[in-house]
């Protein structure tokens, strides 16, 4: 019996190999409960993956299509929604995942090698951790303050 998945693979390979941890996470923006998949993607550090006409699509599962101009227009909106969400954390794709901490039943923190932290809140209510407010069913990305470099110090 599984109580909770932990991103072991991502802790080893994130920053080296792109990943989508579960088949159910393809075309997530087309799913009715996309918020849950979107949060899992943020927690596991994966990028969105979209496929047209996948043979693995089961009847009755939501999917994206491009058979008509209307379907294409709708699917482009779905893909754009996923890309916009990923833009919030896309800079982390080249950094190693250093830590994954379960802070509570519905709150997790993923820490990256550049010091960035992603707080994911699966709860229906806002939560706070480490002084970071995370809205209900959302995530927050906290990036470290930029450190001065030798070249920036010379410019002063």
Protein language model annotation of sequence segments:
Residues 1-155:
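Active-site-proximal substrate-binding groove within the catalytic cores of carbohydrate-active enzymes
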């Amino acid at each position: 019996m599984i109580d909770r998945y932990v991103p072991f693979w991502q802790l080893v390979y994130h920053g080296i190999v792109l990943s989508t941890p579960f088949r159910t996470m393809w075309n997530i923006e087309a799913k009715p409960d996309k918020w849950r998949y979107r949060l899992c993607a943020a927690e596991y550090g994966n990028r969105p993956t979209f496929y047209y006409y996948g043979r693995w699509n089961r009847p009755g599962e939501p999917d994206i299509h491009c058979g008509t101009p209307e379907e294409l227009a709708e699917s482009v909106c779905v893909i754009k929604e996923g890309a916009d969400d990923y833009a919030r954390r896309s800079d982390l794709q080249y950094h190693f995942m250093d830590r994954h901490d379960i802070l509570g039943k519905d709150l997790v923190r993923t820490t990256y090698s550049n010091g960035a932290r992603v707080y994911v809140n699966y709860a229906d209510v806002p939560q706070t951790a480490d002084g970071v407010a995370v809205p209900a069913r959302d995530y927050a990305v906290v990036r470290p303050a930029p450190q001065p470099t030798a070249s920036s110090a010379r410019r002063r």
